[in-house]
Amino acid sequence: PLIQYAVEEAIDVGINEIVFITSSEKYSIKKHFDHNDDIQTQLLNTGKKDMIEKVNPSIFSGIKFHYINQVNQNGLGDAIFHAKDVIGEDPFAVLLPDDLFFSKKSCLSQLIEIYEEKKSTVLAVNQISKSNIHKYGVIKPEDINSAPIKVEDIVEKPSADEAPSDIAV
């Protein structure tokens, strides 16, 4: 699943505590990432030792997973707010595995470098077609020609006519 790539990217940059904000129906995420002793025992007992790494990959050893239920789906900001007790005052990354990007240097490592330099909130954005704008949060940039772009506002899933730009989060 795409979320696997997001988790592996986080682990690759040194993140060792991961919070999943899910609805109560999303048991599959917890089932996917939690160590499952029952399955491991069953695989050992049936001579399928080679399958254990696929079920409980060692990449997750030392990683702490938190699962927080968001009862009412009130947007991304509300989802992040639900993690406040786990995050505290520490810097954090929000990974949205809706899209997958391939690059020589991971998107998250680039964001962390910019954060460490600017000591400010950093967003990864991507230019999208007008026909897809209604699917994304879209930024209203202060100055589209600056680098990095300063964001004045984010409009959640606007129509193409209401979108302040064609740059999505």
Task: Set out the residue ranges of the language-model regions.
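Acidic side chains
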Residues: 12, 34, 78, 98-99, ...
